[in-house]
């Protein structure tokens, strides 16, 4: 497969601040990824960064079955507060199995399977994503070292193996609620994610405001 190429960019005002959106594309498959960039990220200093895998249900439809939408909002807010950073929107929906298969996996979860068991039952690996493209994107953006917003050790290891210096893991524990606590448990126990649970009551953070609301109301 040919290496991904930087093809276009534009200004993108958001509720979190003004970013530069940079489009990337594989020349052979036309597979697309994007990065949101704020500030000077080519000065050699570690950059606050997030690799965010596409999740239509969480990011756009505000599903409570996962923590994706909440993580997206929190990451953009933290980058904006620092005035400098990169968020790669990694276009591998459903941990790489695609939207329709993710819905099929949801149906199996409705019958009692966890998120890993459902993927395996459909003939997929627990996680089909390839994060190496994100290292190529960081390289093309001039980013050499990152403070990575993640709970996922696989992202850290892939970046390190590809030559991106991960100087710090910045935890991203947000959005826990009664609908996704089992999902988060599974990611921690079966995938090694660094999940810290709220030990009092399950709360979720509203992606569009600064307040927190109880998930059980």
Swiss-Prot record:
Binds 1 zinc ion per subunit. It is an enzyme of class 3 (hydrolase). Its EC number is 3.5.4.25. It catalyses: GTP + 4 H2O = 2,5-diamino-6-hydroxy-4-(5-phosphoribosylamino)-pyrimidine + formate + 2 phosphate + 3 H(+). One of its GO terms (biological process) is riboflavin biosynthetic process. GO terms for cellular component: cytosol. Its cofactor is Zn(2+). One of its GO terms (molecular function) is GTP binding. GTP binds at residues 50-54, 71, 93-95, 115, 150, 155. Keywords: GTP-binding, Hydrolase, Metal-binding, Nucleotide-binding, Riboflavin biosynthesis, Zinc. The active site is at residues 127, 129. Zn(2+) binds at residues 55, 66, 68. InterPro entries: GTP_cyclohydro_II, RibA, RibA-like_sf. Pfam families: GTP_cyclohydro2. It comes from the Bacteria. Belongs to the GTP cyclohydrolase II family. Catalyzes the conversion of GTP to 2,5-diamino-6-ribosylamino-4(3H)-pyrimidinone 5'-phosphate (DARP), formate and pyrophosphate. This is GTP cyclohydrolase-2.
């Amino acid at each position: 497969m040919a290496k991904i190429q930087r093809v276009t960019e534009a200004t993108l005002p958001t509720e979190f601040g003004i970013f530069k959106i940079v489009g990337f594309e594989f020349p052979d498959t036309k597979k697309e990824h994007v990065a949101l960039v704020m500030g000077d990220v080519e000065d050699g200093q570690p950059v606050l960064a997030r690799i965010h895998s596409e999740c239509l249900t969480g990011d756009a439809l505000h599903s409570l079955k996962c923590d994706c939408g909440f993580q997206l909002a929190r990451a953009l807010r933290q980058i904006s507060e620092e005035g400098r950073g990169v968020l790669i929107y990694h276009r591998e929906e459903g941990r790489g199995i695609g939207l329709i298969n993710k819905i099929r996996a949801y149906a199996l979860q409705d019958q009692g399977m966890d998120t890993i068991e459902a993927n395996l039952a459909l003939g997929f690996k627990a996680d089909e994503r390839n994060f190496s493209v994100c290292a190529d994107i960081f390289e093309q953006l001039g980013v050499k070292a990152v403070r990575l917003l993640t709970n996922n050790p696989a992202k850290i290891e892939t970046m390190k193996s590809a030559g991106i210096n991960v100087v710090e893991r910045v935890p991203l524990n947000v959005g826990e609620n009664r609908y996704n606590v089992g999902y988060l448990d599974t990611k921690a126990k079966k995938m090694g994610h660094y999940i810290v649970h709220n030990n009092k009551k399950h709360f979720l953070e509203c992606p569009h405001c600064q307040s927190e609301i109880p998930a059980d109301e």
